[in-house]
Amino acid sequence: LELDEKTLTITLNDAGESVTLTSEQATEGQKLFVANCTKCHLQGKTKTNNNVSLGLGDLAKAEPPRDNLLALIDYLEHPTSYDGEDDLSELHPNVSRPDIYPELRNLTEDDVYNVAAYMLVAPRLDERWGGTIYF
């Protein structure tokens, strides 16, 4: 992916600070997302719960909000339910449980960073990202 700085600048944290990715980070994140996440999250939709997508609006309404890079990294390490009440580490793939999710065993910290970063860039690349699922 060859993207401009505006497209590659994403929100870093809850304080609203931003970070600008490299095209290489976005490309690597996309590859890893496709390889590891699209089984349930094709185009940012959620196969197991059509009411919650990976669109920025839905991520912002999660508890805690997941619409920034550090919050998404936290989710990929320690997933919780949308309302933040339940630990989903045994139900949702994550890097903290390689005993349950061996397919994620070899992901590095940089890989997790790039996947989370791609999830924040993706809505700018595909207007259908996180959209409605039609049957």
Curated annotation (Swiss-Prot):
This protein's record includes keyword Thylakoid: yes
Q: Which residues bind heme c?
A: C37, C40, H41, H92
Family to which this protein belongs: Belongs to the cytochrome c family. PsbV subfamily.
* Protein name listed in UniProt: Photosystem II extrinsic protein V
Q: Which PROSITE patterns match?
A: CYTC
What cofactors does the UniProt entry give for this protein? heme c
Cite a GO CC annotation. Answer: plasma membrane-derived thylakoid membrane
> In what way does this protein cross or attach to the membrane?
Peripheral membrane protein
Q: Name one GO biological process term.
A: photosynthesis, light reaction
Locations listed in the record:
Cellular thylakoid membrane
How this chain assembles, per its entry, is:
PSII is composed of 1 copy each of membrane proteins PsbA, PsbB, PsbC, PsbD, PsbE, PsbF, PsbH, PsbI, PsbJ, PsbK, PsbL, PsbM, PsbT, PsbX, PsbY, PsbZ, Psb30/Ycf12, peripheral proteins PsbO, CyanoQ (PsbQ), PsbU, PsbV and a large number of cofactors. It forms dimeric complexes.
Co-factor binding details: Binds 1 heme c group covalently per subunit.
Molecular-function GO terms, alphabetical: electron transfer activity; heme binding; iron ion binding
Q: Does the keyword Iron apply?
A: yes
Q: What does this protein do?
A: One of the extrinsic, lumenal subunits of photosystem II (PSII). PSII is a light-driven water plastoquinone oxidoreductase, using light energy to abstract electrons from H(2)O, generating a proton gradient subsequently used for ATP formation. The extrinsic proteins stabilize the structure of photosystem II oxygen-evolving complex (OEC), the ion environment of oxygen evolution and protect the OEC against heat-induced inactivation. Low-potential cytochrome c that plays a role in the OEC of PSII.
For this protein, the record's SUPFAM superfamilies field holds:
Cytochrome c (SSF46626)
